[in-house]
Amino acid sequence: MPITEAHAGRRYPPCDPYQVSAAKIVEFAAALGDDNPRYRGESPMAPPTFAAVLSARAWDQLFSDPELELSLERIVHGDQRFTFMRPLHAGDVVIAIVTIDRVRVRAGSELITATVDMASRDGEPICTAQATFAHAREVAT
């Protein structure tokens, strides 16, 4: 059965822990072209958008859920918002959990809003990321 409004509220199990490394922070900042010194050194802080790396790992559970019948090649990422409780730092071990907040079905497509809650291994909240995706159903011929 394809994704419907009834799937709102579905919460997936926690993703495998992700250890934020200084090397990944430096690599990410370089990809952004951001030479902020806070993103380098022995104990760098991650750029705020680094949280998208963790969000994408969590979205995999949503996109690969066979019950939802989502085709990744038919998904457009429409919106992204982050709310930080604190910055990400090298050495953080982060657990991410994705929840389907809302599904709107319209004329052969679905708008899906999902939230990824990120916390330290000890349960300290770090960031919440909310994203909206548009998924187009394949038209029967």
Question: Which sequence ranges carry the predicted segments?
Answer:
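Hot-dog-fold acyl-thioester-processing enzymes
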Residues: 1-79, 140
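HotDog/MaoC-like acyl-thioester-processing domains
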Residues: 1-3, 84-141
